[in-house]
C-alpha cells in the first residue's frame, strides 16, 4: 500500500511504513487485504537481460520515486545518496558519472540543455547534461517528490503542499507561483506536472486537475477527478498521483477513489469518464486502456467504449506499478521486486522474474529500441527484452 503523509510543517517527515500500509488500503470502497503471495504460474515468456548496473543505493530506504530520464541514446539516473550517471541506452556503458553533494529527493527531469532535480533541503537544481556539473540552484518553499519538468524555457516544480512554481530554465529565476489547496492527509506520492509550450497541467491531492498558463501561471480551467466522500480523512482520500497521459488534444487522468476520465486539454471539458481507483497513470496500446487498480487488479478496457475486456486479480494488493506495453505483453512490477508479464489478449500471467528484493516502485519504461528499462528501489537498473521461452 502507498505511504501517506499528513500536513505537519516538517521536511522529510515519514510516518511508520507498516502502520500506513495498513491504513492506506482502507476506504469507503476498499477493504484492506494482505498482499497475495507471488502466484505460481506456468511461464511461457522470459525476461532476458541485455545489461544491468547499480545506481548508488537507489532510494536508500526512503519512500521516493527516482525514475530515470530516458533521452534517446542516453539514460540519466540518480540515487538518493547523490550518485548520478549518464548511461548508453544500447550497451549500459557509462558516459559520465558524478557525485552530487546533496541528498536527492526527486527523479530527474530535463530538456535539451539541462537536467533538473530537487534535494532533501528543498532546492531545485539544474545540472549540465554534458557532465552533471551544477548550472544553477534555487530554493523551494517545501519538499518536492515529483520530477521537475521543462519545455526548454520554463522549469516547473510542484511541492507536496500544493504549490506549483515556474522558473527560468536559463538561470533559475522564479517567474510565477500558483497555490493549490491540499487535504490534511494524502498519499506520499505526487504526479509530475505536464509542461507544454502554452499550458501547464498539474494534479493535486484534492482530486483536482488544473491547467495554468505557462507564461504567468494563471489558472485556465480545472477538472474534478475525485470528490472527497465519507466522514474520516482516510475515506476522503482522492489523490491524483499519476501524471496525466496526453492523447492528441486531450489528457487521460485517473485518481484514487475517483474516476478514469478523458478531458479536453484546451477547455477542461469532460469527454468521458468511468469510476476507477488507481495511483498510476493508465497505459494505452492496441486500442485498449490498461489500468493497475489500487487493489492490485489489472484491468483492460476497450478504448472505443471503455467496456472491460478482462480483469486479472492474481496480484491483489501487491502495490503494482503502472503497466507498460511490450509487444504482445503487459509488464508490471511489485513491492517485493518481482516483474510480471501478462498476455494482453486475456490478461493471463505468462512470465515472472525476481529483480530487486527491496521492491520496485518506479514504473518500467520502454526505450526507443523497444527494450524495457527497469529501476529497483535498491538502485538496480537493467534493460530487458521480453521473449517467448525456447
Swiss-Prot record:
Pfam families named in the record: PQQ_2 (PF13360)
Entry's Gene Ontology cellular component terms: cell outer membrane
SUPFAM superfamilies in the cross-refs: Quinoprotein alcohol dehydrogenase-like (SSF50998)
Keyword check for DNA-binding: no
SMART domains in the record: PQQ
Subunit structure of this chain's protein: Part of the Bam complex.
Protein name: Outer membrane protein assembly factor BamB
Lineage of producing organism: Bacteria, Pseudomonadati, Pseudomonadota, Gammaproteobacteria, Pseudomonadales
Amino acid at each position: 500500500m502507498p505511504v501517506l503523509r499528513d500536513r505537519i510543517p516538517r521536511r522529510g517527515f515519514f510516518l511508520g511504513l507498516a502502520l500506513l500500509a495498513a491504513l492506506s488500503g482502507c476506504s469507503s470502497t476498499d477493504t484492506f487485504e494482505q498482499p497475495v503471495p507471488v502466484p505460481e504460474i506456468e511461464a511461457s515468456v522470459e525476461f532476458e537481460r541485455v545489461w544491468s548496473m547499480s545506481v548508488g543505493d537507489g532510494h536508500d530506504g526512503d519512500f521516493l520515486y527516482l525514475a530515470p530520464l530516458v533521452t534517446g541514446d542516453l539514460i540519466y539516473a540518480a540515487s538518493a545518496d547523490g550518485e548520478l550517471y549518464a548511461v548508453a541506452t544500447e550497451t549500459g556503458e557509462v558516459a559520465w558519472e558524478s557525485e552530487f553533494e546533496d541528498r536527492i529527493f526527486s527523479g530527474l527531469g530535463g530538456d535539451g540543455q539541462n537536467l533538473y532535480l530537487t534535494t532533501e533541503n528543498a532546492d531545485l537544481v539544474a545540472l549540465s547534461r554534458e557532465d552533471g556539473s551544477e548550472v544553477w540552484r534555487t530554493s523551494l518553499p517545501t519538499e518536492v517528490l515529483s520530477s521537475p519538468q521543462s519545455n526548454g524555457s520554463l522549469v516547473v516544480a510542484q511541492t507536496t503542499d500544493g504549490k506549483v512554481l515556474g522558473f527560468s530554465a536559463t538561470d533559475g529565476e522564479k517567474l510565477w507561483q500558483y497555490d493549490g489547496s491540499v487535504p490534511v492527509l494524502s498519499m506520499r506520492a505526487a504526479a509530475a506536472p505536464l509542461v507544454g509550450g502554452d499550458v501547464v497541467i498539474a494534479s493535486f491531492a484534492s482530486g483536482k486537475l488544473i491547467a495554468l498558463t505557462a507564461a504567468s501561471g494563471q489558472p485556465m480551467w480545472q477538472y474534478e477527478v475525485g470528490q472527497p466522500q465519507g466522514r474520516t480523512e482516510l475515506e476522503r482520500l482522492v489523490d491524483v498521483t499519476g501524471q496525466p497521459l496526453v492523447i492528441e488534444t486531450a489528457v487521460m487522468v485517473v485518481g484514487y477513489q475517483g474516476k478514469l476520465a478523458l478531458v479536453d486539454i484546451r477547455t477542461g471539458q469532460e469527454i468521458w469518464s468511468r469510476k476507477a481507483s488507481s495511483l498510476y497513470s493508465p497505459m494505452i496500446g492496441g486500442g485498449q486502456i490498461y489500468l493497475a487498480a489500487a487493489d492490485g487488479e489489472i484491468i483492460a478496457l476497450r478504448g472505443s467504449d471503455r467496456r472491460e475486456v478482462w480483469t486479472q486479480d492474481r496480484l491483489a494488493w501487491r502495490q503494482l506499478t503502472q503497466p507498460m506495453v511490450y509487444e504482445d505483453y503487459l509488464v508490471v512490477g511489485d513491492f517485493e521486486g518481482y516483474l510480471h508479464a501478462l498476455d494482453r489478449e486475456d490478461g493471463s500471467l505468462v512470465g515472472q522474474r525476481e529483480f530487486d528484493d527491496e521492491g520496485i516502485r518506479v514504473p518500467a519504461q520502454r526505450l526507443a529500441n523497444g527494450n524495457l528499462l527497469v529501476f529497483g528501489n535498491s538502485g538496480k537498473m537493467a534493460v530487458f527484452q521480453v521473449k517467448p521461452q525456447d
